[in-house]
Amino acid sequence: ISVDGCTSTNDAVFFLSSKKVPLKGKKQLDLFSKKVKEVCIKLAKKIVEDGEGASKFIEITIKGAKTKRQAKKGGFALANSNLFKCALYGENANWGRIVAALGQAGIKVAENISIKATSLKKKQVSVIVDLKKGGFQHTIYTCDLTPAYIKINAEYS
């Protein structure tokens, strides 16, 4: 996840265990792991939804990457791009912002790149970028940057 690309001590999730209830067998461990992942995803989304001044929740999926690392790098390049986040706040489908952010991250973008998004007018926006270079993908959760974000951080004391 990324709200503004900055690390904050205010948004954290801790997972603690007393080890008092042992997990028995692979089936129990798999179920426990699945449920922990579900809770972590819900908490991650909640942190983004509660981002300072955020008006939109944005799910970015980079697919068709050569490697998992490239997919993750591409996702964070968009999630941390002020120009991309401002364009989404303005409901402006300026896909040049996406290509520029990927290029800045060192990802070569082919001419046949595919970019799709749900309606930018909605509170929840999904952006899918297909690099068409391989079989890896990664999803990042972020939010837009708004005038309220600037106001909150300009007046911070």
Question: Locations of the language-model features?
Answer:
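A structural signal for small-residue-enriched, beta-sheet-centric alpha/beta enzyme cores
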Residues: 1-157
